[in-house]
């Protein structure tokens, strides 16, 4: 597999590079000149002297090297090309044809006068004038023949049979006239032999070719240019075909690789197109992601993506509402989020011992909105150990409350399932649920506690009426907790004092005090 050409800056593909090269090569093609420009192929019309002269000069050295053409020439070099174009021009050939017709007419009249078929008063004087005019015209023809031999070369002139015949006709016409004139004077019937000059009328063909050959030669030059361009295009086509074959082979390899990986491109494309519509639908506050087994590494990573809550689930971020919920249950002016599983841990509010790894006691229970408040339908206890980093950033992260939705894998450790709760303890569960919901709704209780903003404490009357009842309910819940978890001896995790404690003391009292059982070794 050949390496394709490197891509140019700007991400230009290889096909565009090749097309640009083809355009440049096409523009750089010079006008094609004729090769082996022989005398018989020269046009007889007025040709561009620059083009024809340059071609003739390029072949001039080859003409000089021929045998028998080294004799002295009066017109050589660039003048030879100019004279050659002049001798082959259409204007000269037209003039020569006209002279041939004229000399034939004059010789015919002279012959008629000499044989006395044409008689008038001054016939003999007129015949003498016609004789000298015909002799001058034949002399011009002879001079033109000599000039052709000198300019074209003797061997080129001899190779052209038509030119040899034309020269012979001129000599046979001129020689008898000169001889009769010297012997008998202008009045001699032998002048009729000069009528052989009529054979030179064939130059009419040269005049016709003078208007046809230029067009023919021009078309031949254009054809040669197109043939060269065709050769270049064929080469480019072969290169492009090879590139297409290579790319097709790579595409087949990639498709085979995707088929081995069981990747469905159509399904992925449809899923990507449906993603904006799925994200635009209203959802709960949190989104559960597939995170696999919940261990220390996945616990440290953010596997829960928070989405924007709906307007119905928006709650007031006010400490007064949290305090009122803590004592009186959920307030009427605060919204309750849709059912979700919240994991409430005691390490979320452990802001006093950031460098000590604490055992977590978590309760996973779905929250439901009931007529009198939130009611718990199921309760499962799971223990996990999370080691927090000993840094300032870890203290800040550790102080935030963990109220994220997660999927808990079933525990591999066998243990007795908790017995079903009797109906008499629903009041206790509702109380504990109120406490957990109030804690789960606060995203960052430590920051609220450190906030210097004034807090509205509950009225003494309300607190006096509520605190003993809450203390009694919490004590009952702690007893039930110890009875329910027979395997894990857990001490009460929530303690209340008879008097109304400060907010900071409440958070400190919620710290975990259970025994460190089944610790996971740190990595």
Swiss-Prot record:
- Entry keyword set: Cell membrane, Cell projection, Coiled coil, Disulfide bond, Membrane, Transmembrane, Transmembrane helix
Subcellular location, principal: membrane
* Tissue specificity statement from the Swiss-Prot or TrEMBL entry: Mainly expressed in the cerebellum. Also expressed in cerebral cortex, skeletal muscle and thyroid, but at much lower levels.
**Record's GO cellular component, any one?**
cytosol
What segments bear the compositional bias annotation Polar residues? Answer: 398-411
Q: Name one GO molecular function term.
A: protein homodimerization activity
List the ranges whose topology is Cytoplasmic: 1-94, 143-161, 213-523
Q: For side Extracellular, which residue ranges?
A: 116-121, 183-191
Keyword Membrane listed? The answer is yes
Segments spanning the bilayer are: 95-115, 122-142, 162-182, 192-212
Q: Would I find Transmembrane among this entry's keywords?
A: yes
What InterPro entries is this protein classified in?
Answer: TMEM266, Volt_channel_dom_sf
Q: How does it sit in the membrane?
A: Multi-pass membrane protein
Locate the compositionally biased regions of type Pro residues: 421-430
Q: Where in the cell is it found?
A: Cell membrane; Cell projection, Dendrite; Perikaryon
What top-level branch of life does the organism fall under? Eukaryota
Q: Where is the composition biased (Low complexity)?
A: 382-397
Q: Which residues form a coiled coil?
A: 218-270
Span list, region Disordered: 380-477
Q: What is known of its domains?
A: The transmembrane segment S4 functions as a voltage-sensor and is characterized by a series of positively charged amino acids at every third position. Transplantation of the transmembrane segment S4 into HVCN1, generates a functional voltage-activated proton channel. The coiled coil mediates homodimerization.
Q: Give the quaternary structure.
A: Homodimer; disulfide-linked.
Protein name (record): Transmembrane protein 266
| Species the sequence originates in | Homo sapiens (Human)
Q: What high-level taxonomic lineage is stated for the organism?
A: Eukaryota, Metazoa, Chordata, Craniata, Vertebrata
Q: Which gene encodes it?
A: TMEM266
């Amino acid at each position: 597999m050949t390496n394709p050409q490197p891509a140019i800056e700007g991400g230009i593909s290889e096909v565009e590079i090749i097309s640009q090269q083809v355009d440049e090569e096409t523009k750089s093609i010079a006008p094609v000149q004729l090769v082996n420009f022989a005398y018989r192929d020269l046009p007889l019309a007025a040709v561009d002297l620059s083009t024809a002269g340059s071609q003739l000069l390029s072949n001039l050295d080859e003409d000089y090297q021929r045998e028998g053409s080294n004799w002295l020439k009066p017109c050589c070099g660039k003048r030879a090309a100019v004279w050659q174009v002049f001798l082959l021009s259409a204007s000269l050939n037209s003039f020569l044809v006209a002279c041939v017709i004229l000399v034939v007419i004059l010789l015919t009249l002279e012959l008629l006068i000499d044989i006395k078929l044409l008689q008038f008063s001054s016939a003999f004087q007129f015949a003498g004038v016609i004789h000298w005019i015909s002799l001058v015209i034949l002399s011009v023809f002879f001079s033109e023949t000599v000039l052709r031999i000198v300019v074209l070369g003797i061997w080129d002139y001899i190779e052209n049979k038509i030119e040899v015949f034309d020269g012979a006709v001129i000599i046979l016409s001129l020689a008898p006239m000169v001889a009769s004139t010297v012997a008998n004077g202008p009045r001699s019937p032998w002048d009729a032999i000069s009528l052989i000059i009529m054979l030179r009328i064939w130059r009419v063909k040269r005049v016709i070719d003078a208007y046809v050959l230029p067009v023919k030669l021009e078309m031949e030059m254009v054809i040669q240019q197109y043939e060269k361009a065709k050769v270049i295009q064929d080469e480019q086509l072969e290169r492009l075909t090879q590139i297409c074959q290579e790319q097709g082979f790579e595409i087949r390899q990639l498709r085979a690789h995707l088929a081995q990986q069981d990747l469905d491109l159509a399904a992925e494309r449809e899923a990507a197109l449906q993603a904006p519509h799925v994200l635009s639908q209203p959802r709960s506050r949190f989104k559960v992601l597939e995170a696999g087994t919940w261990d220390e590494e996945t616990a440290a990573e953010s596997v829960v993506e928070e989405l924007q809550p709906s307007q119905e689930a928006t709650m007031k971020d006010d400490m007064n509402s949290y305090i009122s919920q803590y004592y009186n249950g959920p307030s009427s002016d605060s919204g309750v989020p849709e059912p979700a599983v919240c994991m409430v841990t005691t390490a979320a509010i452990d802001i006093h011992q950031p460098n000590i790894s604490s055992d977590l006691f978590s309760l996973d229970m779905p929250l439901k909105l009931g007529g009198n408040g939130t009611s718990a339908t199921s309760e499962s206890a799971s223990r996990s150990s999370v080691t927090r980093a000993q840094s300032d950033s870890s203290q800040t992260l550790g102080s935030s409350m963990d109220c994220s939705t997660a999927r808990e894998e079933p525990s591999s450790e066998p243990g007795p399932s908790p017995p079903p709760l009797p109906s008499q303890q629903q009041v206790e569960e509702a109380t504990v649920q109120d406490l957990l919901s109030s804690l789960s709704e606060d995203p960052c209780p430590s920051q609220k506690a450190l906030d210097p903003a004034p807090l509205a404490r509950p009225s003494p009357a309300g607190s006096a009426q509520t605190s003993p009842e809450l203390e009694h309910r919490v004590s009952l819940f702690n007893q039930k907790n110890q009875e329910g978890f027979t395997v894990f001896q857990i001490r009460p995790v929530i303690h209340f004092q008879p008097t109304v404690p400060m907010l900071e003391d409440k958070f400190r009292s919620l710290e975990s005090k259970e025994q460190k059982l089944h610790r996971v070794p740190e990595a």
